[in-house]
Amino acid sequence: KEPNTNGMNKKIDDVAKQVSVLSEKIGLITDMIWDEKAPNRNNLSIPPEFASIYKLAKQSGMKEEHLEAIMQTTLENLPVSMKSNPTAVKRYFYSLLRNMLPCRKEISDKKQRIMMLVGPTGVGKTTTLAKLAARFAYGNEKRYKTGIITLDTYRIGAVEQLFQYAKMMKLPILDVIEVEDFQNAIKQLSYCDVILIDTTGNSQYDKEKLERLDKFLKHSGAKIDVNLVLSAGSKVEDLIEIYNGFSFLEIDTLIITKFDETKIFGNVFSLIYETNTPVSYFSVGQEVPDDLVEAKSEFLVECVFDGFTKQKASDE
C-alpha cells in the first residue's frame, strides 16, 4: 500500500505555517526586550506589533521626542483591525512619515529664479551649485539660461573650481567682493532664467560673516531664494543648531548633501520635521550633474528605515 503523500504534505505545510507564526512572535518579543531598560517613554506603551518599527526608527538617529510623538499619533489613529498586523503597522507608519515631510518641487514657471546657497564649511555647496547649474542649463525636460555669481572670495581654490565648471558648461560667471557690486552683477545676468549664487562657508557662530551675507541679500534689489546646504552625516543636534544660526536669513529650502557618506537618516527627518522647512534636493554622490535628485519624501523615508543605495537614487 502506497503512503498517503497528500496527507503528509498537508502536515508538513501545517508545521511550516506554525513555525512561521512562532518565528514572527519570537521576533516581536525580541524587539520588545531590546529596549526594556529604557525610560518609560512618557508612559507610551508600545505594543509588540509596533516594536520592530519603533526599534528601526530609534536606531536611525531620529530625535526620541519626535519618534514618541509620531508613534503616539500612529497608536491613536491606526484602525483597530490593522493594529495586530506588523506589516500593516509598518505601512501606516511609513505613510505617516511621508506626509510629515514638506518637499519643494522645482519651479518651472517663466519668472526669473535666483538661488543663493548658504551653509557651513565642508558640506559641498560649490559642487552642489555646479550640479544645479548643469541640471538647469542642460536638463532633459527643459533648458534654462543659467548664470553664476560667486561671493566666496576666501577660498581661492573653490572659486577657481567654480570658474572651471562654468567654462566647461559655457555659462557666464561673475565674482563679487563688495556688497555694493552685488545688485549690478544680478542686473548683468538679467537675461538669465536662473541665477545661482555661491557663498563662503560660514560657522553658525560667526555672526560677523553671517551679517555680511545678510547685507548682500538686503542690497540685492531682487527676490532671492535662500537654500541652506547641510550634510546628512551631521548629528541631529548640530543640524538644528546650524539651522537656527542661519535662520535669520529667512531660509526658503534645505538641500541635504553627502547621502553616500552615512548610514543613518533619522537625523535628516528630525531636522525637517522640527523646522518644518521644505527640502528641495538631495545630493547623493560626487558626480556632476548626475548625483543630485529632486527631494521626495518617499525616498527619505526609505533611507531612514532601509538605508541608502545609489539604485534608490537613480530610481528617483
Feature-to-residue mapping (PLM):
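Pre-Walker A adenine-sensing motif
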Residues: 96-109
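Short hydrophobic/aromatic beta-strand immediately N-terminal to the Walker A/P-loop
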Residues: 114-116
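Hydrophobic positions on the alpha1 helix immediately C-terminal to the Walker A/P-loop
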Residues: 128, 132, 161
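Conserved C-terminal guanine-recognition region of P-loop GTPase G domains, centered on the G4
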Residues: 130, 165-167, 185-189, 206-276
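NTP-binding/hydrolysis catalytic cores, primarily Walker-type P-loop NTPases
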Residues: 268, 272-316
